[in-house]
Amino acid sequence: MGIFLLFLVLLAVPQAAPESDTVTCRKMKGKCSFLLCPFFKRSSGTCYNGLAKCCRPFW
């Protein structure tokens, strides 16, 4: 019984942890910038828990 409960908890833990905003930015082919986004890039979210901007290309 105890092993079964441990197995259920181990399956639930990775699904409960949300993906960080930095990982989400990198998956969308963005780069993190603490200043303004460079030319030909637009801000589309945050990085480093809201401390930086996620800059992605226009196209």
Swiss-Prot record:
Disulfide bonds: C25-C54, C32-C47, C37-C55
Function: Has bactericidal activity.
One Gene Ontology molecular-function label: CCR6 chemokine receptor binding
Protein name from the UniProt record: Gallinacin-14
Protein family: Belongs to the beta-defensin family.
A GO CC annotation given for this chain: extracellular space
InterPro entries: Defensin_beta-like
Organism phylogeny: Eukaryota, Metazoa, Chordata, Craniata, Vertebrata
